[in-house]
Amino acid sequence: MSGVQGASVGIDLGTTYSCVGVWQNDRVEIIANDQGNRTTPSYVAFTDSERLIGDAAKNQVAMNPANTVFDAKRLIGRKFNDPATQADIKHWPFKVTPGAGDKPQITVEFKGETKTFQPEEISSMVLIKMKEVAEAFIGTAVNNAVITVPAYFNDSQRQATKDAGAIAGLNVLRIINEPTRAAIAYGLDKKGGERNVLIFDLGGGTFDVSLLTIEEGIFEVKATAGDTHLGGEDFDNRLVDHFTAEFKRKHRKDMTQNQRALRRLRTACERAKRTLSSSAQAYIEIDSLFDGIDFNSTITRARFEDMCGDYFRKTMEPVEKVLRDSKLSKSQVHEVVLVGGSTRIPKVQQLLSDFFNGKEPCKSINPDEAVAFGATVQAAILSGNDSSEKLQDLLLLDVTPLSLGLETAGGVMTTLIQRNTTVPTKKSQTFSTYADNQPGVLIQVFEGERSMTRDNNLLGKFSLDGIPPMPRGVPQIDVTFDIDANGILNVSAVEKSTGKENKITITNDKGRLTKDDIERMVQEAEKYKSEDEANNVRIEAKNGLENYAYNLRNTLNDEKLQGKIDESDKKVIDDKVTDIINWLDHNQSAEKEEFEAKQKELEGIANPIMQKMYAAAGGAPGGMPGGMPDMGGAGAPPPASHAQGPKIEEVD
């Protein structure tokens, strides 16, 4: 491998679900998690005793809504006062507050304490889970990953995602665009002439459209557009609003302040939405939803389509935009490829088909796994795994989604790099001073498409000082914009006569974690991981004691042993088992050592009696239906004189 240590994976870090893959046996393997699912919910839950990630977190969300965090991708790299963040907060049961620099932070109760997390930390926990899923499958440590982001993510959102990878202990080989990777899943094995392919990627929280040209293993992105705040979650929100209004109308009760009821309703709405992709009608039945009232209702596909019609129509705007930007007509698009779970909605497919004059969208790739598939191929290439014939001639040419430039006199946006420029790229332009004898210039870097910088997004700024006194317009200042393969920008400025230089990597410190923050979060992630492991060991000890106690009781009550054990001995063990079970009921959160001590205590009483019983029975004829209880290593085999009975091995 070319300087990359350990295994490399591709991770699709989704708003609602995440997916991981590895390149093995000359193909992509999408890896199932411990529940057997190939996608894992991007959920993290905090309880009194443990942290849960993935399916386990999502499964308990109705019981613990305030401390179960999801949709972190909708917060990452955004400001607290961003209108999109404010709109989301209304629908989230967990608490989001403004932190330093107007960054959103998530507050939860964990092990009896109030804890605050950055969105990057929550995303890093999901990444750690995906890393563990991959490690369980591969059998070795996973150190490197290619992580995907929506093509329309801006600079700060990309940086924040990269930080999340670092906190998870991953070497992030590349941050890449989702639709481009999905195109690989579509085109990896396709041979033949040049094809124009439109990738329509509508997921749980984000929406992207990219237009690519694919020819003999070369994937060139021509244009990209999208909405980083549109997806299945928004359709769920409409359904939740509809049913809360219906509940209020029918029962004269407002359930909008009850987070548990809202969460149960949301889960039912998500299920109904999926049902409507294959049926004309879906039923909602929730027992004792609010104030003991059972809620039953129906929703038709037509009503759902009407309810979300504006969202569905909105998805066509970026399609028109990429066609304009790439200067192609509808008829020049050879294939429309669907990616993301929300593209299963029939209305979305119909709108697309109508837009392309009846052309049926391609459904040959799995919309949930396509992005992870492409990320895995990229990880294999970047980690030097290009001995594979399939990967040798593969070339990916991606683009920057937004125009980049700087502010010139009067607040005008002067663009150096146009949107949809292939990356990596480098552009330079010469500027000068605005006033006579001006000693320095302030270089302010913006991204966006508007003509005035006030309407665009400020990425960063720096000064170039020490310019010798000269009339306005005489000094020559060369400004260079350089975008790397991750889509992250470096800007430098040089004054030609003096050679004075200053530069900035747009790390977007306003929205970004400092190196110290990342270091601290890496250490905290390690601490949480070791706490999780310690908790698992504790639970194993508890389960071991519980199993031992119940097995012992089952053995005592076994018909085949009736009359072979003294009633007094039986009572001694039975009383002790009852004591232990009562103790367990009241000490669920005891330490591992306490469970082990109780097990030894029980073994100390039970083992001599059980040995005496088995010795008297001459071995253990016929095998006990209840099974020999685990003696925890304390039981000795029966004496040799009774060797005529079948041998019993100790159960580990």
From Swiss-Prot:
Pfam families: HSP70. InterPro entries: ATPase_NBD (IPR043129), Heat_shock_70_CS (IPR018181), HSP70_C_sf (IPR029048), HSP70_peptide-bd_sf (IPR029047), Hsp_70_fam (IPR013126). It comes from the Eukaryota. GO terms for molecular function: ATP binding; ATP-dependent protein folding chaperone. Induction: Constitutively expressed, but whose rate of synthesis is augmented by nutritional stress such as nutrient starvation or excess of organic nitrogen. SUPFAM superfamilies: Actin-like ATPase domain (SSF53067), Heat shock protein 70kD (HSP70), C-terminal subdomain (SSF100934), Heat shock protein 70kD (HSP70), peptide-binding domain (SSF100920). Keywords: ATP-binding, Chaperone, Nucleotide-binding. Residues 619-635 have a biased composition (Gly residues). Disulfide bonds: none annotated. Residues 618-652 are annotated as: Disordered. Belongs to the heat shock protein 70 family. This is Heat shock 70 kDa protein. It comes from Achlya klebsiana. The lineage of its organism: Eukaryota, Sar, Stramenopiles, Oomycota, Saprolegniales.
